[in-house]
């Protein structure tokens, strides 16, 4: 299995007020805290699943 060091850059674009607690925990797990905060993570299936779960809150920058 080859290791690719591809990264995904995320930005939190919507507020967490009024969202489910599990979605808030997922956003925290992605390393995002405040609106417009940016986090760069490894591109893994687990991270992709987390992004899909909170896709209405985050934007993939690159």
UniProtKB/Swiss-Prot annotation:
Alphabetized GO MF terms: structural constituent of ribosome
Coiled-coil regions listed in the entry: none
GO cellular component terms attached to this protein's record: cytosolic large ribosomal subunit
InterPro entries: Ribo_uL30_ferredoxin-like_sf, Ribosomal_uL30_bac-type, Ribosomal_uL30_ferredoxin-like
One Gene Ontology term from the biological process aspect of the record: translation
Keywords on record: Ribonucleoprotein, Ribosomal protein
Alphabetized Pfam families for the sequence: Ribosomal_L30
Quaternary structure and interacting proteins, as annotated: Part of the 50S ribosomal subunit.
Homology family: Belongs to the universal ribosomal protein uL30 family.
Entry-linked PANTHER family: LARGE RIBOSOMAL SUBUNIT PROTEIN UL30M (PTHR15892:SF2), MITOCHONDRIAL RIBOSOMAL PROTEIN L30 (PTHR15892)
NCBIfam families according to UniProt: rpmD_bact
Full protein name: Large ribosomal subunit protein uL30
Species classification: Bacteria, Pseudomonadati, Pseudomonadota, Betaproteobacteria, Burkholderiales
């Amino acid at each position: 299995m080859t290791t690719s060091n591809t990264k995904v850059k995320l930005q939190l674009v919507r507020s967490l007020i009024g969202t489910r607690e599990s979605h808030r925990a997922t956003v925290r797990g992605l390393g995002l805290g405040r609106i417009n905060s940016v986090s760069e993570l490894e591109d893994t299936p687990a991270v992709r699943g987390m992004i899909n779960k909170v896709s209405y809150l985050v934007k993939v920058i690159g």
